[in-house]
Amino acid sequence: RSRGLGDVYKRQVEGINRLAFTDADWAGRQYIIDRMTDAGLSIEIDDFGNVIGYKSGKKPELPVVMVGSHTDSVPNGGNYDGVVGVLSAIEVIRSMIDDGYEHDHTIAVVDFMCEESGRFGNATLGSKAMRGELTVQDLHRLVDKQGISLYEALKGRNLNPDGIEIMKYKRPVKSFTEIHIEQGKVLEHERKTIGIVTGIAAPERFYVTIRGNADHSGATPMNLRHDALCGASKIILGIEEIASMQEEPPVVGTVGVVEVTPGAMNVIPGAVKLGVDIRSISKAARDSVVTLVKEFIDITAEKRGLSYTIETIAQDQPVEMHPAMIREIEEAVKSVGVEYMTMPSGAGHDAMHWAEVVPTGMIFIPCRDGISHNPAEFAEMDDIVTGADVLDKVLRKLSLEETKLV
C-alpha cells in the first residue's frame, strides 16, 4: 500500500515532493482517507486538517488508544518516512476487523498534517495543533519561501485557522504509539530488526541573518571588506566544532539553509541568512551548545565588522517514553521472536508531543544504510511487516480495559 500512496506523490527524478498543504500532499491525504474508509474506520477532520480514523470499542466512554504518524514529506524526500506508520496502523485495524477482534477502548488512527519542517521551518505542527500548542499569531508568523503563511495555507484548504486556539483534542487519551523507520544506521549496524525507543531528541531552531556591505567585488580591497558570506562560513564551521565538542550526552548541529544576498558574482555578499538546527536528547546539553553558538556568532560578527539578528522559530522539548509502554512493546517483540534493542531517537516525531501528557511508545524498523529525507530511503518489506506485527500485538493489548499503564 505504500507503493499505492507513492503513486499519488508528486514524484520527480530527485524524489518525493509532498510538502504540507500542497496539491500533492492533499492527494496523498485523500489516499489515506480512502484507505481508512476501506478498512471500516469512521473519519474525523479537525480544523488543522489532521485526519483521524476511529474503530469503536465496546466501551466508547473509555479514553481512546491513539496510533499515528504522518504522510507529508521533505523536499526531494523518500517513500517510507511517516508513511510506514500510518499505513501499518490502518492495516492493523483491518486485521482486527478481519479477525473479529473485540476490544474495549476505541482506537484512533491519525495522519498528522505538516510533521515535516520543510515548508514552514517548524516541525510536528499537526500534533502541536491537536495538543493546543499553536496560536493564530504562530500561523501568521510561519511563512514559506513563496511568502505564503501557514494561516493562508490553511485557509486555502478550507480549514479553520481562526479556531486553532480552541481545537485541542477533546477526547481523553489512554496511550499514543508510533511506528517509524529509524532514519539512522544503528539497527542495521547492530543487526536488530526492531528498535524500542527510550526517548526522543528535540531541536532548537533559529535563523541567523548576518549583514555586511554589498560592495563592488573588483573595486573593494580585501582589507576594506565586510563580507557577510565569509562571516557566515566561519559561523557554520564554528557550529560544527562546538556541537562536536559536546560528547556525552551528544548534541548535533546543522546549518541546513544558506541564503545569500544579492547573489551576484561581481558583488560582495551583503547579507546571509542561515537556518540552524541544534538538537539533543538532553535539554541541558542542547541549551549549553546553543549558548556557546550564540556567543561565537557575536564574537565573529564583531571581529569582522558585521551585524546580525537571531530569530528563534522552535524550541521543542526532549522527552522520555513511558516505562509501561516500553515494557508493552518489548513483550510484543519477544512474542514475535525477533532481535531488538532499546535506543534513543535522534529525530523528532509526533510522538514527542503526546509523551508530555499520555503514556507514549515508539517502534523503529531499520532503513537501508540509515538513509532518510532522501530519494534513496528504503525499508525492506519483511521489516515493515514485522514492525506491523509488533504494532498489532501492542494495540490489541492496549485496547483492553484490563491493560493498565503504570
Model region roles, listed by residue range:
Residues V67, N76-E116, E204-I210, H216, ...:
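Alpha-helical metal-binding/catalytic segments enriched in His/Glu/Asp
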Residues T198-I200, H216, T220-M245, A285, ...:
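His/Asp/Glu-rich mid-to-C-terminal helical/loop segments that flank catalytic regions of hydrolases
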Residues D7, G68-S69, Y340-V390:
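Zn-dependent metallopeptidase/amidohydrolase metal-coordination segment
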Residues E14-S56:
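A non-catalytic alpha/beta surface segment that caps or lines the substrate-entry region
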Residues L19-F21, T254-G263, G275-S282, S307-I326, ...:
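A short beta-alpha structural unit
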Residues C114-E115, G121-K283:
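Midchain, well-structured core segments that form catalytic/ion-binding scaffolds
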Residues R1-Y9:
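Single conserved hydrophobic/aromatic residue that forms the stacking wall/gate
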Residues A39, V51-V84, H216:
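Catalytic-core environment of secreted peptidases
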